[in-house]
Amino acid sequence: MTHASLPLALTQGDPAGIGPDIAINAWAKRRENGVPPFIFIGDPDVVASRAALIGVPVNIETCDPESAVSLFERAFPILPLPVGFDVQAGQPHVGAAHATIKAIEMAVSLTVEGRAAAVVTNPIAKSVLYEAGFGFPGHTEFLADLALRQTGKPVTPVMMIAGPKVRVVPVTIHIPIKDVPTALTEELIVTTCRIIDTDLREKFGIAAPRLAVAGLNPHAGEDGALGTEDRDVVHPATIRLRKDGIDAFGPLPADTMFHDAARKRYDVAVCMYHDQALIPAKALGFDDSVNVTLGLPFIRTSPDHGTAFGIAGQGIASETSLVAALKMAAEIYARSRVGA
């Protein structure tokens, strides 16, 4: 199979959520939105019932990745992964956890084996997976473990939200805010920023990335008056990064980093915790932002929203963020093939 013929490996996510809805909508609007070919890893019965529920005609064909690209124009290609029970839209069930996890594992395997171009994941419900014994805080950490299992090499995953107006990275991710000051170390900031710098160059074609580093505390700590972390941890990290030739500057007061003029000064905002990064990202591009995992030996993107159980099966879920995630994955893959 040539590189040009590789499909994207799209996971079902939680089958009771809007993953099936938005995948169906993305395929139905593939021509008008220029959606790159994907193979959907999930349950054909879920797709068929959800398509009927939301009133979108879809021609389903089960296939392997090698056939997906040629099928994509006329059919919704599925690599079958039965859930094992009758899924009801909007009603999450622990019985779906195994298939949800297995779909992610299959997508990673296909991509590492060179049978798919990239992994694109639909939203999962962490609480449902935890009930089934899932031992990871979220997608990002699970993907890092899969990368280790597939390649034998440990990785440090970095979550970046990329939208049309801003890119953001939280240095700490899925931990309680009370634990952030302890988890936030100079070494973690330096490692995260090195990965950002490398991947913005290699995956996004930015020749000289500019990294704006936010402070942890209000006003970036006011030189220790409002907390010592920015003075003692964040600032030394930026000094080390600049010595390494990485254009990282800060710590900056986070409340002045996201207005129009400020965003022109950097390529990515490096934030200290989850909500410091994701609130501005979603405020500036809720429908068309993409979650990209940097630092992995394969490409992974996902829509920047959750399972939205409350609207699953109602025909009102927007596929915009998923389409953006599919397009970004395809663009990164195409860029990676230049000169390969």
UniProtKB/Swiss-Prot annotation:
Keywords: Cobalt, Cytoplasm, Magnesium, Metal-binding, NAD, NADP, Oxidoreductase, Pyridoxine biosynthesis, Zinc
Family: Belongs to the PdxA family.
Species for this entry: Agrobacterium fabrum (strain C58 / ATCC 33970)
Cofactor notes: Binds 1 divalent metal cation per subunit. Can use ions such as Zn(2+), Mg(2+) or Co(2+).
The name this protein goes by in its record: 4-hydroxythreonine-4-phosphate dehydrogenase
Enzyme class, first EC level, given as a word: oxidoreductase
Any Gene Ontology biological process: pyridoxine biosynthetic process
InterPro entries in UniProt: PdxA, PdxA_fam
Gene Ontology CC, one term: cytoplasm
Residues that bind a divalent metal cation: H174, H219, H274
Cofactor(s) essential for the protein: Zn(2+); Mg(2+); Co(2+)
Disulfide bonds: none
Comment field (misc): The active site is located at the dimer interface.
